[in-house]
Amino acid sequence: MVKEKDKPKNEIIIETENLNLFYTDFKALNEINIKILKNSITALIGPSGCGKSTFLRTLNRMNDLVEGIKIEGNVIYEGKNIYSNNFDILELRRKIGMVFQTPNPFLMSIYDNISYGPKIHGTKDKKKLDEIVEQSLKKSALWDEVKDKLNTNALSLSGGQQQRLCIARTLAIEPNVILMDEPTSALDPISTGKIEELIINLKESYTIIIVTHNMQQAGRISDRTAFFLNGCIEEESPTDELFFNPKNTKTEEYISGKFG
């Protein structure tokens, strides 16, 4: 059972200002302006190809890895523009972590999957690493299931366990924000329920932005929802308002299933 959502704080942690993104000559994002509240869950919904995953990747500069990308506008994280020339991209990706659609554990043990990030960032003490591994797995609701087999290959876990492992791996490097790109689309309903409950619990300590095609999921877990269409945000508001009293005709048509 997914617990009731708590109200988020009113502190802004991420804000985009007139954000545009081009793939060569194609404009994939058009004048995106949105404020993300600290310790909130924001859902990004919309039809395939609408720009929601592209937008998600602008928030920790994952789109930098794609050839031919051009960005205009600002993404302000904790008061600083992440696209400024002197911004530390590695530190950005530590503070704004990413969980992908398909679970992608490393081909190594459960323990090494979690300790890998902290080691890369300079943690060498075995006792400290043990503590990070345990706490990260507890936060991701996986510890009780794997504590007696930490040296087992991570690929031996079920799909749902692998996704929670990937979340634990993200938590191990102490992010402030967690980006999730359809994290349950490849999972069965029971595993999906566990991930949703985990996401709501994580909101107490982290800010979460999730892309989902599942509007029921957005309604269950998110505080605010942004509806994307053709590279634009058509509407963004508290989730209950957007689903039950949309202000935009296109939003109403989408959530009622008239297109998608």
Curated annotation (Swiss-Prot):
GO CC annotation terms, alphabetical: plasma membrane
Keyword Transport among record annotations: yes
Any one Pfam family match given in the protein's UniProt record, by short name: ABC_tran
EC number(s) on file: 7.3.2.1
Domain ABC transporter stretches: 14-255
Family as reported in the entry's similarity comment: Belongs to the ABC transporter superfamily. Phosphate importer (TC 3.A.1.7) family.
Name used for this protein in its record: Phosphate import ATP-binding protein PstB
Taxonomic path: Bacteria, Pseudomonadati, Spirochaetota, Spirochaetia, Spirochaetales
Gene: pstB
